[in-house]
Amino acid sequence: MALLQWMLENISDDNSIKMSLEEQHETFQINVKWLKFLNLSDSDIVQLQNVYKLVQRDRERLIIYPDPQNVHSWSYLCSPEEIKVIIVGQDPYPDGRGHGLAFSTVRGCSPPNSLKTIFAELERTIENFKAPAHGSLKSWCAQGVLLLNTVFTVIRGVPMSHEAIGWQVLSNRIINQLSEKMQNLVFMLWGSQARKLVSLIDSKKHLILECAHPSPRTKGSKTPFIGCGHFLKANKYLQIHNKCPIDWNITNDL
């Protein structure tokens, strides 16, 4: 309630604001190709401006992850028309290891526990997969895997601290537009937060894969991550629809 009151008192709600794609790019630092694809409404733009004001307010007094230049790095590593698989995460790692890609870390950082679980499932199902010592998943992005958090920033040391500031206006739009405009995509929804997005996806056009979050804290779930087989299922679906499967092995050249 305190956050909502602050927003009402300090942030303009001028729905008459018009922004060109170039202005949106300068303001939000999202790739222009994605901005064209998303076709944000005036209302979306105003809400995003409000989110950015809140993030900037926090940056002035706290440490916020990731750095501004990496908040939307997802939009620069694969174009909308290249997307084949969408893996939905929650929010950035609160220890600074992230770089704007769900579950991925900067090179030189060891994989967090959730990513170790992901690697364990890959080792279980993908022939010759070997877990790397680092946690960068950029090589997946180069093949059309969108690693998308539903919340794009976080206060250092406080997981989900920016969950309530409004980032979902963007992440929901991304999911919705991919579902509407594309065909035969694979959506991997891991955990309760990601599974809330299922209503935004047309199951007649796309494959939706759901299971527990790979965090060790979800051990014992009715739909555990280990054993989900999502990576194999995704590749089989892509091949059925005449798309190249994903090479899930983590390369060392990115």
From Swiss-Prot:
Cite the Pfam families for this sequence.
UDG (PF03167)
Locations listed in the record: Host nucleus
Q: Which SMART domains match?
A: UDG (SM00986), UreE_C (SM00987)
Molecular function in Gene Ontology: uracil DNA N-glycosylase activity
**Gene3D superfamilies this protein is in?**
Uracil-DNA glycosylase-like domain
Query: Which GO annotations describe the biological process of this protein?
Result: base-excision repair, AP site formation via deaminated base removal
Q: Which residues form the active site?
A: 91
Keywords of the record? DNA damage, DNA repair, Host nucleus, Hydrolase
* Reactions it catalyzes: Hydrolyzes single-stranded DNA or mismatched double-stranded DNA and polynucleotides, releasing free uracil
Q: Does the keyword Disulfide bond apply?
A: no
Q: What class of enzyme is it?
A: hydrolase
Q: Function, please?
A: Excises uracil residues from the DNA which can arise as a result of misincorporation of dUMP residues by DNA polymerase or deamination of cytosines. Therefore may reduce deleterious uracil incorporation into the viral genome, particularly in terminally differentiated cells which lack DNA repair enzymes.
Q: What is this protein called in UniProt?
A: Uracil-DNA glycosylase
Question: What is the species listed in this Swiss-Prot or TrEMBL entry?
Answer: Human herpesvirus 7 (strain JI) (HHV-7)
Q: Which gene encodes it?
A: U81
